[in-house]
A protein has these predicted regions:
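PLP-dependent aminotransferase-like
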Residues: 71-143
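Conserved PLP-binding active-site segment in aminotransferase class I/II-type PLP enzymes
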Residues: 1-72, 76, 97-98
Length: 143
């Protein structure tokens, strides 16, 4: 017997705490400090404490987060980064912005995530990172 799993309902989640969400968004918009303001600073401090670290940096997009992570690893010109071919553009864009070459691998047929066998076959002396993407709520096989 097949089990039906409901999709995540963004509207229901929003409506469950609408007043608090609206107040927080309005406060940030009215402050004019969307990126580097006190609310972001507070979030960074709370997140760092939650993670048990001294620092956390909030960024404006997933692309920026990926780019910072790749740059922190020293990835750049002449390097290769392996990622899955069926990801969205920002994954490959972040790699390209470092000057590194994107090496795409295909998916495995069950979870539609990167195929570990293809990752292994794609590794060269220039490979500096493997950038998995966990699609559709299914974690990629990192083993």
């Amino acid at each position: 017997m097949a089990m039906r799993i409901r999709m995540y309902d963004n509207v229901a989640q929003y409506l469950s705490d609408k007043e608090a969400i609206d107040a927080a968004v309005l406060s940030v918009l009215e402050s004019g400090e969307l990126v580097m303001g006190p609310d972001v600073r507070a979030l960074e401090e709370e997140f760092a404490a939650y993670c048990g670290t001294n620092y956390a940096v909030g960024v404006t997009s997933g692309t920026s987060a990926l780019l910072l992570a790749l740059r922190a690893l020293g990835i750049g010109e002449g390097d290769e980064v392996i990622t899955v071919a069926n990801s969205d553009i920002p994954t490959s864009q972040a790699v390209t912005l470092t000057g590194a070459k994107v090496v795409w691998v295909d998916i495995e047929p069950v979870g539609c995530n990167m195929d570990p066998d293809q990752v292994e076959a794609a590794i060269t002396p220039k490979t500096r990172a493997v950038l998995p993407v966990h699609l559709h709520g299914v974690p990629a096989d990192l083993g």
